């Protein structure tokens, strides 16, 4: 799981970390990458309180390599992350940030979910149960289909 900058990711973090115990993937290690815009005290709380099997770290320069080798990506659906997920053909769950006047992540994730490229957990459904179900669906569907998706900008 990755948070981009991390400044507005608390709902996603709590739901996704809680989803591990409810998912069919509860026996494997989950890695959580939190951006540097989340204050250090909040980051330390996530790191120090993470359940067994969940590794919480700051964002890393080898993110693309991690993404290419992971089973699944959970993110807010930022442009860069989505493009990297599609390029890596990594199964994905999007939990878009939709606070304030933000709508681009939701629109992007809805369109890609409609095309079968990822699962989406909408703003009003962000909890551990919904995220776990989306994780299990994404993994059972396999890698995102890229044929039919216009990746040319």
Question: What role is predicted for each listed range?
Answer:
Residues 24, 86, 113-114:
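Anion (oxyanion) recognition and catalysis
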Residues 58, 94, 120-122:
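Structural signal for conserved beta-strand scaffold positions within catalytic alpha/beta enzyme cores
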Residues 1-72, 106, 124-125:
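Donor-nucleotide binding loops and adjacent catalytic segments primarily
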Residues 133, 137-153:
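C-terminal amphipathic helix plus adjacent low-complexity
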Residues 61-105:
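A donor-sugar binding/catalytic signature common to diverse glycosyltransferases
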